[in-house]
């Protein structure tokens, strides 16, 4: 995606920093130095400073605050800040106890942060520099003297170093603890596409990934990974490949940290910025499950979110931190997990993190009610005939799904067709099962239950209410007549429509499913003629193309979009199927 609301990189970076200060009044932005700092810092504690190119937010700036980073210096997007900027940041939060500078293992970062560090040392001040290197995708042979790249493990080093400094530990101890964390880190990423940097030309088409292609190990600045994969593997297969690179001790090129099943491990899942939280959350769970199943690793802490992004990158990363060993410093032992658990006041760090992931729900789960199975009809129907009629209807609906989806994408959110298809597939599965009965009331009520289980959103609720009302109408009618006929079904449909109207303001003329449903029901009640009722439903659906929508997301569509309502088309597909 090469479209942005703000295309000036300098405006982006500086205003992004100012936003953090807007939210946290203990933070101040140094505009000339382009860094943000915690102005209430304790001058007797070690100051912890980090930074790097912009575009990786919340790293580094959102982790500035009490108990974490003292300052973070920002370069332009994907470019290291200058040594002058960094040195100004160091002087801004100078401490009696000294300064620990943390950067990621990239040449530009090391040179600029290192130059600033040497200036501070020349001035007679205590200062140390550590570079986070946690990427496993580029092995020892390829990385050579440069070493591993720095990825999302950097955030855990920020947290641990900041917590150690907040305890008042000396610079040597804080540095030793932070280095111990780096030595136990492994990370890897996977991406579906390169990212576009605001203000830059789009990536050349010949360099862009194809639709059925992804890159394993792609860096956070669009750098190449270890390989491109086509076709894109299943998520389970992809996770297996990623964990193998992280944990396979037989791969001497990448076996940086030995992690075994009985180790204490922290898992950090990183969203590169462009994955929906729904998809990212599902991926995170799959990683946790794969660790347990394939490696017997059960993390003691799990973090998931956008920690070190690549602008709006379509990808994710996995970071594992081995925390089994206590770090020994001057006769004292320190737990990395305890330091991670230590409270902070930094905007980017998760506030809600339970200290014991092994805690389980002890009260048990309530069961989902199956419905009233004690209601019975005084009559039965030809089971196979009804079954086939329903099958015809649902298959016709499934066949119509692409058309429904097309029109709903033009005038809505595009999910009407797929939602109806899910419901149809659920009904088909039910009617072909042993649970399908010859009791007409139970058939209708069970279909209502199936709809509840398989169709979400507004349309699912509307159809479920309609069919529950249908079952009630059938029950009331059969209690009086004890005879099953087209009039019985018509009476049930009339009650179903009345029931639906209790819960929706939609009426004919509003460009909704009601424009097809109401004429169908009214015609069938009046004539008991199915074909005539279906024809009226078609006319009602066709008419919606010229209506102004008054309900649903279609309300926001421009008047020039003339398409029939997708919900009305769905009704037509259902009732039309009964005539086949």
Curated annotation (Swiss-Prot):
Annotated Gene Ontology cellular component terms: cytoplasm; cytosol
Catalytic activity: dihydroxyacetone + ATP = dihydroxyacetone phosphate + ADP + H(+); D-glyceraldehyde + ATP = D-glyceraldehyde 3-phosphate + ADP + H(+)
GO function terms (MF aspect): ATP binding; glycerone kinase activity; triokinase activity
Gene3D superfamilies the UniProt entry points to: 1.25.40.340, Dihydroxyacetone kinase, domain 1, Dihydroxyacetone kinase, domain 2
Keywords, comma-separated and alphabetical: ATP-binding, Glycerol metabolism, Kinase, Nucleotide-binding, Transferase
Stored SMART domains: Dak2
Classification via Pfam families: Dak1, Dak2
Enzyme class, spelled out: transferase
Residue ranges of every copy of the DhaK domain listed in the record: 8-349
Signal peptide annotation: none
Domain DhaL, residue spans: 384-580
InterPro entries assigned to the protein according to its UniProt record, in alphabetical order: DhaK_ATP (IPR012734), DhaK_dom (IPR004006), DhaL_dom (IPR004007), DhaL_dom_sf (IPR036117), Dihydroxyacetone_Kinase (IPR050861)
Functional summary from the UniProt entry: Catalyzes both the phosphorylation of dihydroxyacetone and of glyceraldehyde.
Family recorded in the similarity comment: Belongs to the dihydroxyacetone kinase (DAK) family.
Subunit structure: Homodimer.
UniProt protein name: Dihydroxyacetone kinase 1
UniProt organism field: Schizosaccharomyces pombe (strain 972 / ATCC 24843)
């Amino acid at each position: 995606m090469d479209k942005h609301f703000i295309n000036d990189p300098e405006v982006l970076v500086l205003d992004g920093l100012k936003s953090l200060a807007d939210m946290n009044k203990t933070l101040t932005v140094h505009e000339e130095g382009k860094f943000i700092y915690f102005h209430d810092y304790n001058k007797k504690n070690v100051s912890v400073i980090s930074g790097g190119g912009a575009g990786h937010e919340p790293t580094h700036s959102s982790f500035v605050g009490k108990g974490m980073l003292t300052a973070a210096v920002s370069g332009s997007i994907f470019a290291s800040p200058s040594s002058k900027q960094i040195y100004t940041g160091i002087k801004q939060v100078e401490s009696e106890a000294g300064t620990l500078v943390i950067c990621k293992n990239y040449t530009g970062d090391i040179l600029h942060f290192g130059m600033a560090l040497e200036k501070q040392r020349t001035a007679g001040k205590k200062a140390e520099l550590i570079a986070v290197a946690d990427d496993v995708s580029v092995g020892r042979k390829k990385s050579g003297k440069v070493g591993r790249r720095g990825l999302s493990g950097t955030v855990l080093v920020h947290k641990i170093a900041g917590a150690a400094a907040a305890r008042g530990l000396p610079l040597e101890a804080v540095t030793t603890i932070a280095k111990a964390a780096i030595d136990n880190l492994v990370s890897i990423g996977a991406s579906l596409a390169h990212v576009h940097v605001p203000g830059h030309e789009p990536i050349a088409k010949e360099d862009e990934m194809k639709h059925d292609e992804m890159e394993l190990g792609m860096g956070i600045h669009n750098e190449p990974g270890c390989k491109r994969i086509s076709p894109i593997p299943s998520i389970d297969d992809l996770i297996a490949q990623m964990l193998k690179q992280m944990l396979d001790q037989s791969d001497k090129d990448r076996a940086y940290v030995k992690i075994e099943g009985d180790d204490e491990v922290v898992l950090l899942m990183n969203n590169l910025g462009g994955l929906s939280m729904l998809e990212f959350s599902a991926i995170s769970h799959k990683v946790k499950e794969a660790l347990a199943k394939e490696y017997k690793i059960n993390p003691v802490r799990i973090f998931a979110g956008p920690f070190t992004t690549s602008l709006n990158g379509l990808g994710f990363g996995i970071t594992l931190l081995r925390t089994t060993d206590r770090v020994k410093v001057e006769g004292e032992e320190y737990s990395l997990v305890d330091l991670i658990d230590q409270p902070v006041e930094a905007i980017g760090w998760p506030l809600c993190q339970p200290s014991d992931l092994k805690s389980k729900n002890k009260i048990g789960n309530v069961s989902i009610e199956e419905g009233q199975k004690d209601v019975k009809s005084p009559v039965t129907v030809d089971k196979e005939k009804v079954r086939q009629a329903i099958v015809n209807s649902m298959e016709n609906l499934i066949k119509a799904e692409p058309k429904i989806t097309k029109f709903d994408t033009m005038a809505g959110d595009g999910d009407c067709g797929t939602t109806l298809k899910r419901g149809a597939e659920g009904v088909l599965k039910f009617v072909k099962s042993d649970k399908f009965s010859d009791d007409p009331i139970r058939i209708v009520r069970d279909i209502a239950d199936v709809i509840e289980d398989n169709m979400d959103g507004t349309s699912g609720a509307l159809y479920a209410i309609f069919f529950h009302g249908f079952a009630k109408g059938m029950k009331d009618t059969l209690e009086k007549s004890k005879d099953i006929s087209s009039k019985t079904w018509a009476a049930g449909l009339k009650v179903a429509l009345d029931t639906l109207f209790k819960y929706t303001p939609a009426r004919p003329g509003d460009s909704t499913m009601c424009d097809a449903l109401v004429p169908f029901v009214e015609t069938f009640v009046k004539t008991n003629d199915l074909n005539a009722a279906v024809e009226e439903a078609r006319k009602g659906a066709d008419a919606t193309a010229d209506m102004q929508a008054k309900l649903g997301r279609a309300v926001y569509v421009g008047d020039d979009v003339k398409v029939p309502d997708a919900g009305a088309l769905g009704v037509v597909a259902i009732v039309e199927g009964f005539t086949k």
